[in-house]
């Protein structure tokens, strides 16, 4: 293991945050209100609605498509009223932050004060509002709301994975240095361990480390240290880029 990023011996900020997960009934109520603001309705008991383990799907196949996730209330919305030639043209539209906020407001979407506007890719018409683990008054704002805009400044798709959660309880968090030591000892995400052991890289470069929050199916946002890694398999398996894994940040 080769460390190529700065680490600290200071403990990370304490705290576990939570958003009360949606039930199916909650999802139905949210979806009905959301599409209702667009002048559409949901026909329950028809193929317009489908439920999965982690999310629910709603679409009348003419006006809208909406995915709603139970654990953190995130959702993905597509406006089918915007001509498909515009949506699939590959050419994005230009839009200002104020105009995009106004378009989102018409959909009933509020942007948290902690989120900042970013022009992700203007040629593709992709814009976002992002917040990276911002904590204010025991409220955690994290993630991003991504918008797709067609030529003419027409908003047609919104992926809202910008979560807002409240402090559930304080819990000790290890330092990034201790997380690095656990990483080197193989104590990282169990999903990545089998492939790591199979590939058996000769040398792993640790190029970045940052504290993030992951949401479980009970709505808890728990701290983890996310590491960006690079090894000799990057070119053959990952298009020349590195890979990431995480180490749980709670002490113990």
Give residue ranges: language-model regions.
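Preferential activation on post-signal-peptide N-terminal prodomains/segments
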Residues: 1-138, 161-166
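Segments that shape or occlude catalytic/ligand-binding pockets
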Residues: 82-90, 95-236, 242
């Amino acid at each position: 293991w080769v460390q190529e990023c700065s680490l600290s011996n200071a403990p990370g900020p304490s705290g576990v945050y939570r958003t009360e997960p949606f039930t199916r009934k909650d999802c139905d109520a949210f979806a009905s209100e959301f599409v209702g603001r667009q002048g559409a309705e949901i026909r329950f008991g028809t193929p317009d609605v489908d439920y999965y383990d982690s999310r629910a799907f709603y679409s009348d196949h003419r006006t809208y498509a909406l995915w709603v996730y139970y654990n953190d209330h995130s959702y993905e919305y597509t406006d089918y009223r915007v001509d498909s030639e515009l949506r699939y043209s590959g050419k994005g539209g230009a839009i200002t932050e104020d105009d995009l906020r106004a378009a989102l407001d018409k959909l009933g979407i509020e942007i948290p004060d902690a989120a900042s506007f970013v022009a992700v890719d203007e040629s593709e018409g992709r814009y976002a509002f992002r917040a990276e683990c911002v904590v204010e008054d025991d409220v955690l704002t994290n993630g991003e709301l991504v918008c797709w805009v067609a030529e003419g400044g027409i908003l047609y798709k919104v992926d809202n994975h910008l979560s807002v959660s409240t402090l559930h309880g304080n819990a000790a968090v290890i330092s990034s240095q201790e997380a690095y030591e656990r990483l080197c000892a193989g104590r990282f995400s169990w999903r990545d361990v089998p492939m790591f052991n199979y590939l058996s890289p000769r040398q792993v470069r640790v190029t970045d480390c940052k504290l993030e929050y992951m949401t479980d199916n009970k709505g808890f946002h728990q701290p983890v240290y996310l590491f960006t890694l690079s090894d000799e398999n990057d070119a053959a398996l990952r298009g020349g880029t590195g890979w990431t894994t995480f180490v749980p940040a709670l002490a113990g």
